[in-house]
Amino acid sequence: MKRTYQPSKIRRQRKHGFRHRMSTKNGRRVLAARRRKGRKVLSA
């Protein structure tokens, strides 16, 4: 059986990247929460 995680930089950015987070209300909420928590990296 093959592994379920087959990394792809493009898919990673499109689904979890900064611009994708900014494109939705909830995504912006995620970024705000990560800023509030003091995360060094906000998104993929």
UniProtKB/Swiss-Prot annotation:
Under Gene Ontology molecular function, one entry of this record is:
structural constituent of ribosome
| Record InterPro entries | Ribosomal_bL34, Ribosomal_bL34_CS
Instruction: Tell me which PROSITE patterns the record gives.
Output: RIBOSOMAL_L34
Recorded GO cellular component terms are:
ribonucleoprotein complex; ribosome
Chain positions covered by the region annotation Disordered: 1-44
Alphabetically sorted, this entry's keywords are: Ribonucleoprotein, Ribosomal protein
Q: Pfam families in the record, alphabetically?
A: Ribosomal_L34
Q: Name one GO biological process term.
A: translation
Which PANTHER family does UniProt cross-reference here? LARGE RIBOSOMAL SUBUNIT PROTEIN BL34M, MITOCHONDRIAL RIBOSOMAL PROTEIN 34 FAMILY MEMBER
Q: Which family does it belong to?
A: Belongs to the bacterial ribosomal protein bL34 family.
Task: State the protein's name.
Answer: Large ribosomal subunit protein bL34
Q: Which organism is it from?
A: Streptococcus pyogenes serotype M1
Gene designation: rpmH
